[in-house]
């Protein structure tokens, strides 16, 4: 085995040392003071003041250092700086394994990679060389922040596995862009080369999306924030934009309904699972599964709806651009004291027209507070005008039952019935009845029929 060759030259008190460990690898060292000692039988070179190690495009600076000759391991202390090409790592102290190109940095760690527009700060930073996409894996402990272009990632602990391009953020994890963010106790990030592909949050998930909207057409833009919470969350990305967000277990979301940059209202919805589809950062579709409940609060005169709308169902599907909502399985909608329920409900928010369909014995039903419900096989209802049409309608009044081929409802709570029947028999096909071609019902007052 070739023994290390040491060349020592004293120049105005500065010690220059050239240590050749092999034909391929060498350090060029300099310091104010140097001494060689043995620790546990290993030759160790100690350097003090203005320590400098140089190898090809790597430069390491420190106040003092110890070099373990056989394994080529550097122990660096005080104002430690490693420069590798354009990348710079600074810290209080560091252990560097030269043969492995691996480092363990401690105290006020700051790692800057200008070409990748990336900066990391932490308390403890351990990295090692890999043959993966980024060229190294790492472990960072202490309050850790990573800035990549305009994205900030932070956690008390961050691990990155370059082989699988997988990053794990533990304790107070967060990922934020200028207009959106995701938070949670623990977070897993999947990369596809340089691009963010997926984020999974497995506890106490929270996300937000900032919007600039107007309250008045000629007014100035104001900042609003959509918010989403759940136990677990999965976010998928396409071309650096979030494309889909899935909220699981006790999911809730608050989002703002927008009409051409004008705030139309605020929607709050909850359920077991919520799926939100985005396009370039804007919500395009929202699906709620499992005990879905919602509340829409209109903004001033920006919509024809002038008070809170409550709604729900086992499943809700809201298409934002089309302004359509589909509710199913125990679907209901309540507005200004009138409640409509059905197996399926389709709402057009642009026209405020509701279509309700009979599904699995869940009949379309409309009921005004204090009055008997009216039900039928299908229903069309105008939420604003409170006018509606019910096919094969049925209701009870004054201990009797009224049937009609079609029932038209006017506000306030007036029903016009075509081909009507009145009976005291509660069957859908009564044994006896009084019939009329037209009937007008005023609940709590009287019924007008002509001709009998």
Predicted feature locations:
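Structural signature for solvent-exposed beta-strand/loop edge elements and short helix-capping sites
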Residues: 24-452
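Bacterial Sec-dependent N-terminal signal peptides
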Residues: 1-27
């Amino acid at each position: 085995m070739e023994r290390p060759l040491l060349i020592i030259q004293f120049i105005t008190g500065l010690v220059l040392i050239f240590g050749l460990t092999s034909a391929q690898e060498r350090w060029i060292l300099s310091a104010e003071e140097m001494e060689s000692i043995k620790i546990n039988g290993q030759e160790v070179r100690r350097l003090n003041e203005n320590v400098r190690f140089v190898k090809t495009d790597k430069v390491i600076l420190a106040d003092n250092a110890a070099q373990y000759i056989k394994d080529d391991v550097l122990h660096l202390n005080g104002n430690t700086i490693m420069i590798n090409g354009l990348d710079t790592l600074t810290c209080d102290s560091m252990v560097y394994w030269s043969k492995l190109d691996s480092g363990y940095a401690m105290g006020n760690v700051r790692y800057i990679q200008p070409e990748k527009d990336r900066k990391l700060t932490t308390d403890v930073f351990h990295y090692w060389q890999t043959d993966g996409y980024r060229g190294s894996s790492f472990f960072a402990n202490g309050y850790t922040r990573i800035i990549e272009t305009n994205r900030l990632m932070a956690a008390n602990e961050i691990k990155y596995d370059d082989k699988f391009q997988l990053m794990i953020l533990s304790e107070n994890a967060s990922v934020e862009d200028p207009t959106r963010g995701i938070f949670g106790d623990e977070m897993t990030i999947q990369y596809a080369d340089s691009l963010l592909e997926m984020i999974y949050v497995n506890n106490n998930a929270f996300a937000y999306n900032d919007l600039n909207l107007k309250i008045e057409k000629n007014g100035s833009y104001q900042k609003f924030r959509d918010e989403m919470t759940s136990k677990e969350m999965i976010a998928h990305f396409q071309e650096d934009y979030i494309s889909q967000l899935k909220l699981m277990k006790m999911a809730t979301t608050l989002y703002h309904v927008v009409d051409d940059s004008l705030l139309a209202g605020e929607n709050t919805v909850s359920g077991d699972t919520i799926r939100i589809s985005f396009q370039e950062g804007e919500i395009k579709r929202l699906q709620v599964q499992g005990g879905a409940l919602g509340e829409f609060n209109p903004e001033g005169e920006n919509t024809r709806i002038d008070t809170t709308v409550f709604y729900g169902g086992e499943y809700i599907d809201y298409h934002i651009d089309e302004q359509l909502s589909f509710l199913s399985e125990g679907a209901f909608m309540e507005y200004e004291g009138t409640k409509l329920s059905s197996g399926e409900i389709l709402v057009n928010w642009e026209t405020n027209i509701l279509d309700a369909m009979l599904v699995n014995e869940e009949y379309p039903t409309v009921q005004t507070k204090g009055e008997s419900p009216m039900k039928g096989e299908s229903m069309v209802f105008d939420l604003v005008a409170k006018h509606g049409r019910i096919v094969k309608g049925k209701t009870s009044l004054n201990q009797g039952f009224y049937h009609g081929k079609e029932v038209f409802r006017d506000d306030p709570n007036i029903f016009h019935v075509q081909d009507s029947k009145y009976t005291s028999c509660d069957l859908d096909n009564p044994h006896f009845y009084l019939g009329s071609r037209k009937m007008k019902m005023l609940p709590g007052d009287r019924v007008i029929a002509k001709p009998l």
